[in-house]
């Protein structure tokens, strides 16, 4: 387990934390946390709180609404998991916490973190359960009947079990929207608003995400009350430890360029992002034909196949994962050292989520962007948006990677 003292630091000046009640607390022991929760935190492998944890946990425990922003790989999931667990009363086997995630994989990962950090708080190992699409609704109904204190799920399935009357909302204390920018995008906004219709009016709402565009902050005014804001300056929104490069290449030469990279560079594990399911399958097929151990994943695959692919990649049995933006948000694979954007993302926010797959928890990582002539303007937009510089890949790149 990667420990928090290995998480990529965010500079104190990176935070716009001029609101009252937002001050860094450098030790978990100095936070208002139950002893059994502290046991779980240290048992999980955390030693010192990351920057976002230093700022977000204490305001979370006070019960007010929160908008918190932190880069991928900086302990964001730990921050809201700890804050959420502190707010719950484990003497009552009632559903009190709800976490909404944009993907099944992220929901499953989040539930595991909450379960492990909270293992000394509950007599039941099943106090936290997942509710996601691609599984039998009947199984979810049985989970709820047996008793759940924390529910983690995707909006569609959570909305379904609420409407069935199986997930009772009157005892809910806390709602967390993870990857809030995605959750409030056009695809999820209607489902989120539908869920809010069933929630207690005094429920605590916490939004956590790596990016928080102004339009999302405007949307939050509809359902949040005087939230504490813990935001990062835009110029700080490129991960420390991630070196970014581009290769100028025409579309028809991208595959050959990719093959050349894998022939000349020693890569521990890498993620390749493409923008369509068809291209993902094609890249994976070509790499496998060239004797590379490659896995591929996209949203149209069955849930069981996606879980199998992720387990294979996490274990190191597969060293290359080709995927769409499905895994760009929050999927934890600690040994990825190179991210390749075979296609530049269509949306600037997803660039940050993608390159966050490399160099997680303070490790050195590299992002390589394949840029066609028509992509040049988008590349400049990404540089301007994050106040960063993306250099052309040096000729001696293999030597650089071996440093």
Curated annotation (Swiss-Prot):
A motif (Q motif) lies at residues 26-54. GO terms for molecular function: ATP binding; ATP hydrolysis activity; ATP-dependent activity, acting on RNA; RNA binding; RNA helicase activity; translation initiation factor activity. A motif (DEAD box) lies at residues 178-181. eIF4F is a multi-subunit complex, the composition of which varies with external and internal environmental conditions. It is composed of at least EIF4A, EIF4E and EIF4G. It comes from Leishmania major. ATP binds at residues 70-77. This is Probable eukaryotic initiation factor 4A. One of its GO terms (cellular component) is eukaryotic translation initiation factor 4F complex. Residues 1-29 are annotated as: Disordered. ATP-dependent RNA helicase which is a subunit of the eIF4F complex involved in cap recognition and is required for mRNA binding to ribosome. In the current model of translation initiation, eIF4A unwinds RNA secondary structures in the 5'-UTR of mRNAs which is necessary to allow efficient binding of the small ribosomal subunit, and subsequent scanning for the initiator codon.
């Amino acid at each position: 387990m990667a420990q928090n003292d290995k998480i990529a630091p965010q500079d104190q000046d990176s935070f716009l934390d001029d609101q009252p009640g937002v001050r860094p607390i450098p030790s978990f022991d100095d936070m208002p946390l139950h002893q059994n929760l502290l046991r779980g935190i240290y048992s999980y492998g955390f030693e010192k709180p990351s920057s976002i944890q230093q700022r977000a946990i204490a305001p979370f425990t006070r019960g007010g609404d929160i908008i918190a922003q932190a880069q991928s790989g900086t302990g964001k999931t730990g921050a809201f998991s700890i804050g959420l667990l502190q707010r719950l009363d484990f003497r009552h086997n009632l559903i009190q916490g709800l976490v909404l995630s944009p993907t099944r994989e992220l929901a499953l990962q989040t539930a595991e973190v909450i379960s492990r950090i909270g293992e000394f708080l509950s007599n039941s190992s099943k106090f936290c359960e997942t509710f996601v699409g691609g599984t039998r609704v009947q199984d979810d109904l049985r989970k709820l009947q047996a008793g759940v204190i924390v529910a983690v799920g995707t909006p569609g399935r959570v909305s379904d079990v609420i409407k069935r009357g199986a997930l009772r909302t009157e005892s809910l204390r806390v709602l967390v929207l993870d990857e809030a920018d995605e959750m409030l995008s056009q695809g999820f906004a209607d489902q989120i608003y539908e869920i809010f219709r069933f929630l207690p009016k005094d429920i605590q709402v916490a939004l956590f995400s790596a990016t928080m565009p102004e339009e999302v902050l405007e949307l939050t005014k509809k359902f949040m009350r005087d939230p504490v804001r813990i935001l990062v300056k835009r110029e700080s929104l490129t991960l420390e430890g991630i070196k970014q490069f581009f290769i100028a290449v025409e579309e028809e030469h991208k595959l050959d360029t990719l093959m050349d990279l894998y022939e000349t560079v020693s890569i521990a594990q890498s993620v390749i992002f493409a923008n369509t399911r068809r291209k993902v399958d094609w890249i994976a097929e070509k790499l496998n034909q060239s004797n590379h151990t490659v896995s591929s994943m996209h949203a149209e695959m069955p849930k069981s196949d996606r879980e199998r692919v992720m387990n294979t990649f996490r274990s190191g049995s597969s060293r290359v994962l080709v995927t769409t933006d499905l895994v760009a948000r929050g999927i934890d694979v600690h040994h990825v050292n190179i991210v390749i954007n075979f296609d530049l993302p269509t949306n600037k926010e997803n660039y940050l989520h993608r390159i966050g797959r490399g160099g997680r928890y303070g490790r050195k990582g590299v992002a390589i962007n394949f840029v066609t002539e028509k992509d040049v303007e988008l590349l400049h937009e990404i540089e301007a948006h994050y106040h960063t510089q993306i250099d052309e890949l040096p000729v001696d790149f293999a030597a650089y990677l071996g440093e």
